[in-house]
Amino acid sequence: MDLTLVGQLISLFAVVAAGPLVIVFLSARRGAL
């Protein structure tokens, strides 16, 4: 399997997963949750 393709998929998944996680993390730090 092409490592470049794997790297792109991992990067894409990381960006998609990090978005909501960052929002939840910031909300939790503010005591919103």
From Swiss-Prot:
It is a single-pass membrane protein. Its main location: plastid. It holds the Pfam family PSII_Ycf12. It is found in: Plastid, Chloroplast thylakoid membrane. GO terms for biological process: photosynthesis. The chain crosses the membrane at residues 5-25. Keywords: Chloroplast, Membrane, Photosynthesis, Photosystem II, Plastid, Thylakoid, Transmembrane, Transmembrane helix. InterPro entries: PSII_Ycf12_core-subunit. One of its GO terms (cellular component) is photosystem II. Coiled coil: none annotated. Belongs to the Psb30/Ycf12 family. A core subunit of photosystem II (PSII), probably helps stabilize the reaction center. HAMAP family: PSII_Psb30_Ycf12. PSII is composed of 1 copy each of membrane proteins PsbA, PsbB, PsbC, PsbD, PsbE, PsbF, PsbH, PsbI, PsbJ, PsbK, PsbL, PsbM, PsbT, PsbX, PsbY, PsbZ, Psb30/Ycf12, peripheral proteins of the oxygen-evolving complex and a large number of cofactors. It forms dimeric complexes. This is Photosystem II reaction center protein Psb30. It comes from Nephroselmis olivacea (Green alga).
